[in-house]
Amino acid sequence: MKSHHILDASGVFATMVIVVFFVAGMLSTPSFAQEKKTEEKPALDTKFENLNHRLDQLAKSIDDVLWYDKVGDVANIDKIFIVGPPPAKVKNPTAMGAKNPVKFWSYVFIPQKLDRSKKYPLLVLPHGGVHADFTTYHTHIIRELMAQGYIVVAPEYRGSTGYGRAFYEQIDYGGLEIEDNHAARDHMVENYDVVDADRVGLIGWSHGGLIALMDVFEHPDDYRVAFAGVPVSDLVQRMGYYNDEYRQQFSAPYHIGKTANEDVQEYRRRSPVTHVGKLQTPLLIHTNTSDDDVNVLEVEHLIEALKSAGKKFEYEIFEDIPGGHSFDRIDTKKAKEIRLKIYKFLAGYLKPPHPFSSLADLEKAGYK
């Protein structure tokens, strides 16, 4: 499917450079300095926050164009606008449209050499980050999945960056974002004839790993297999080893609105470790002892909880692999070897038409 963009990549980049220089110039002008002295700090904070969201939107526009350069030779790329449940919180519940479903974008990648008379496995790939988005950081993973014959949908669930402040503040970490992710799955199954509804899998890292776990726990009949890499697993434990700035993202009024200390049960409800008893689907979990984001102890807690619940699953705890939190998503030989393990696990259940049998297959597919 062709994209309709006003600017090419170089044009968008030039626009961003102009905006950045304009902002820098604005901040250094005497009039702005005077305004800074006289205006209330909360109002200034709001202006800066709104400006940050505008820059995020511009960065998103640039990255959307870059997808065509990065994977356009192997994938048909689309971006679809779909809906999830209504907002978790509404400032004015009686306002017009207050209870409308939340609208969000999702990326769709379909192999170019796909035979439209056949059906193919689908992978749902939620991005990570408390507030983040799906970007060309995933280029090699998408190329590798296209080569194997997977269709991929990557939802920009509520709270993702690049879509403005209002959408950012719709975040519902471990809550309705899970249903957004599942809505992307349902949309693909219902609207794409080439998707095999009996061969749908989940794959995610970090916060995306949490979403993969929670979705497969809540909707076991809709997935054949799931992979969770370095997944956020226990929010109560996590709040204990993170700093105040991180914790404040969760206790913000538009989010959970309370600290873990004030409402332990709410944080437990949003944690995969609380729901391990629901697992019915083949699952692979990876973690790394040198992870600098999701402490290995957090994932080990999840693993032990699954064992205690008598669940069958597979896992591997890697010892001090270079790359920390991103150890299996970077471009080192070891990272690619680990991705090959993941792909072989998924292929055992999803039966893609062109599964990788060697590291050479992966490297040929993922790297130009």
Give residue spans per PLM region.
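N-terminal secretory signal peptides that target proteins for export/translocation
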Residues: 1-11
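Generic detector of N-terminal low-structure segments
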Residues: 15, 23-24, 152, 329
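Bimodal feature
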Residues: 1, 133, 360-361
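N-terminal targeting or regulatory segments adjacent to alpha/beta-hydrolase or S9 domains
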Residues: 11, 17, 22-23, 27-78, ...
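Active-site-proximal cap/loop segments of hydrolase catalytic domains
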Residues: 82-86, 157-368
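Short beta-alpha junctions and helix-cap segments that line functional grooves
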Residues: 66, 92-93, 137-141, 212-213, ...
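Cap/lid segment of the alpha/beta-hydrolase catalytic domain
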Residues: 74-104, 109-198, 205, 240, ...
